[in-house]
């Protein structure tokens, strides 16, 4: 699809990884390197992010999920595993609601069904205000610090900063609007896919109540909690994260 960059590596059954707010496909590097030996790994840059930064950004989770489904249809990928992180986890919940029959196994990772994000380190509206007052670079850096136990000393912190820098102010604000206005709680009961829920116990973006809402309402779900991890488990404990996902998928 025009202006949408999709990294496509490896061979085998398709595994689609959807990044979150201020992210990009580059943030999946440890996963791409690991999974491409067993899977065809599909990692899109969402519209307005990464190498899709020339594409028009969206202010609705539903419209982003429609776009991704269209992209997969265009690539003739009719059946796939699907993993979404953070805002990407909201997107994959909506994709499962619309096209659950196309999804073999689903992973909801460091995400939740409530867009207002109760218990977040700051409200979504505060993040919007910070964007306006402090600018994108400072706001993105401050947010990324909360994604790791070690903050900016974390090994993969710079990947997150580089991804954030490729994002425009308009895209960042539109994403926050999309997050705030989305609520997927009522649709969870309709997700019939075998689902793995992954969460770090020090996550400052999505609290335990959000995770438990997923677990209690998705019928065929299993929860795995990583100890001493914040929001970006896949970059804090990549080896254990990758093994956990592989064991679930195979």
Where are the regions that the model predicts?
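Acidic catalytic loop of the alpha/beta-hydrolase fold
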Residues: 202-206
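Conserved alpha/beta-hydrolase catalytic His-Asp/Glu region
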Residues: 116-122, 133-189
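Flexible "cap/lid" loop of the alpha/beta hydrolase fold
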Residues: 93-98, 103-134, 138
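Gly/Ala-rich beta-loop-alpha elbow adjacent to hydrolase catalytic centers
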Residues: 84, 88, 92
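Active-site loop/oxyanion-hole signature of alpha/beta-hydrolase fold enzymes
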Residues: 33, 42-83, 243
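Short beta-strand/loop motif that positions the catalytic acidic residue
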Residues: 191, 197-199
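Catalytic histidine-centered segment of alpha/beta-hydrolase-like enzymes
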Residues: 229-238, 242
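Conserved HGGG/HGGXW glycine-rich cap/lid loop of the alpha/beta-hydrolase fold
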Residues: 4-54
């Amino acid at each position: 699809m025009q202006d949408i960059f999709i990294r496509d590596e490896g061979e085998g059954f398709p595994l689609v990884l959807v990044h979150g707010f201020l992210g990009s496909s580059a943030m999946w590097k440890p996963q791409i390197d690991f999974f491409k030996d067993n899977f065809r790994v599909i990692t899109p840059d969402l519209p307005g992010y990464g190498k899709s930064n020339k594409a028009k950004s969206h202010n609705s989770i539903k419209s982003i999920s429609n776009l991704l489904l269209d992209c997969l249809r265009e690539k003739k990928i009719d059946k796939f595993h699907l993993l979404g992180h953070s805002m990407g986890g909201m997107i994959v919940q909506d994709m499962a609601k619309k096209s659950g029959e196309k999804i073999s196994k689903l992973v909801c990772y460091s995400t939740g069904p409530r867009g207002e994000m109760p218990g977040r380190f700051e409200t979504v509206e505060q993040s919007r205000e910070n964007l306006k007052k402090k600018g994108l670079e400072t706001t993105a850096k401050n947010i990324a610090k909360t994604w790791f136990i070690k903050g900016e000393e974390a090994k993969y912190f710079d990947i997150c900063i580089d991804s954030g820098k490729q994002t425009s102010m308009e895209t960042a604000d539109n994403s926050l609007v999309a997050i705030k206005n989305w609520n997927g709680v009522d649709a969870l009961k309709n997700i019939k896919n075998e689902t793995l829920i992954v969460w770090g116990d020090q996550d400052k973006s999505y609290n335990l109540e959000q995770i438990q809402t997923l677990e209690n309402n998705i019928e065929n779900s299993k929860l795995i909690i990583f100890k001493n991890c914040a929001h970006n488990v896949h970059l804090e404990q990549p080896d254990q994260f990758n093994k956990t996902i592989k064991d679930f998928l195979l």
